[in-house]
Amino acid sequence: MTTQASTFAVAVPSVATPFRRHRNPFVVRAQAEPSDKSVEIMRKFSEQYARKSGTYFCVDKGVTSVVIKGLADHKDTLGAPLCPCRHYDDKAAEVAQGFWNCPCVPMRERKECHCMLFLTPDNDFAGNEQTITLDEIKESTANM
């Protein structure tokens, strides 16, 4: 026997039903990955911008990989590479405003990248590379 919870519109087991372990029904998991084309576009953009700005990727290429995939996902879903490291109440409005589209205004004006994608040489987390391969991105993010 189940009752309908009107607030959330989900079935709730009655008290008589024994407790069963199931995944949390309120957890939403993303199913889609960004397209390989968008990941490649954002990879190339990131390499070019690092060279142009005199910045470097994080010594942990996993950080670089996750950010590039986040940018690619936003490029696919929003049409622009909105910074994936921030919370937005309205992503579409943020894309239209352009402030947080990569490279964001703080990066362009002061070389401050919140995502740690573009790091100045004096940053403790900066590596010495301005390149990353598509295979490195796939390998770093395979189990995520």
Swiss-Prot record:
Co-factor remark: Binds 1 [4Fe-4S] cluster.
Residues of the transit peptide: 1-31
Top EC class of this enzyme: oxidoreductase
Annotated catalysed reactions: [thioredoxin]-disulfide + 2 reduced [2Fe-2S]-[ferredoxin] + 2 H(+) = [thioredoxin]-dithiol + 2 oxidized [2Fe-2S]-[ferredoxin]
GO cellular component: chloroplast
Residues forming coiled coils: none
Main location: plastid
One Pfam family named in its UniProt record: FeThRed_B
InterPro entries xref list: FTR_bsu, FTR_bsu_sf
UniProt keyword list: 4Fe-4S, Chloroplast, Disulfide bond, Iron, Iron-sulfur, Metal-binding, Oxidoreductase, Plastid, Redox-active center, Transit peptide
Function: Catalytic subunit of the ferredoxin-thioredoxin reductase (FTR), which catalyzes the two-electron reduction of thioredoxins by the electrons provided by reduced ferredoxin.
Homology family: Belongs to the ferredoxin thioredoxin reductase beta subunit family.
Name of this protein: Ferredoxin-thioredoxin reductase catalytic chain, chloroplastic
Source species of the chain: Glycine max
Gene from which this protein is expressed: FTRC
